[in-house]
Amino acid sequence: MTSQRSTSGQRHEQARIGIMPPEILQKRDPVAVRRILESLPDWFGDPGAIDNYEMAAADIEFVSIVAVDSGNVIGVSLTRRHFRESAELHLIAVDPMARGRGIGRALIDHVAADLRNDGCMLLSVHTVGPSFENEPYAHSRAFYRATGFHPLEEHNNLDWAGPILILVRKL
């Protein structure tokens, strides 16, 4: 009995101080996508790109997974299945107030498990390439590497005029 009370008490304390893991679920929330992207100007400074991501969040071509904490969406991911064997992580973003809590990793792990369970073998993601020196995107590349992605190739003029790094993760 004591250990159950202790565990229950620990959960209540975690909830009280806001460190409970978020709920990860499939949900479309274009408004939350816009809100989170607008709060990350180092990565999403182009209003047109934010408009496009907001539209993608409403598009059934994309699977939208969100992280919810105390009723608020604090993280978003959009994936698109190109072929049965492969998918693209089109967007992942976490509210800056929730960064460092493992939300991004939880979203990617959830997406990867869902895709793997559906027969997908490979997940790709595009980000600004290392030949364009930019500290926020250096953090993004390190995050992707830490979550199991490996660099495949870098191209210019793919998603923007500069270099794009394509990373892949075996599922």
What are these regions (language model features)?
Residues L115-P136:
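Conserved GNAT acetyl-CoA-binding A-motif
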Residues I24-L91, D95, I108-D109, D114, ...:
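Acetyl-CoA-dependent GNAT
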Residues F62, G162-L167:
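Short hydrophobic/aromatic beta-strand or adjacent loop that forms the aromatic wall/cage
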Residues Y53, S131-F132, W160-A161:
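Short secondary-structure capping/turn micro-motifs that flank functional sites
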Residues I92-R99, G129-S131:
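A short, internal acetyl-CoA/4′-phosphopantetheine-binding micro-motif in the GNAT/acyltransferase core
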Residues G100-A113, N117, A138-H139, A146:
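Conserved acetyl-CoA-binding loop-helix of GNAT-fold acetyltransferases
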Residues R141-E154:
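Conserved acetyl-CoA-binding loop of GNAT-fold acetyltransferases
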Residues M1-R28, L171:
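Conserved N-terminal entry element of GNAT/NAT acetyltransferase domains
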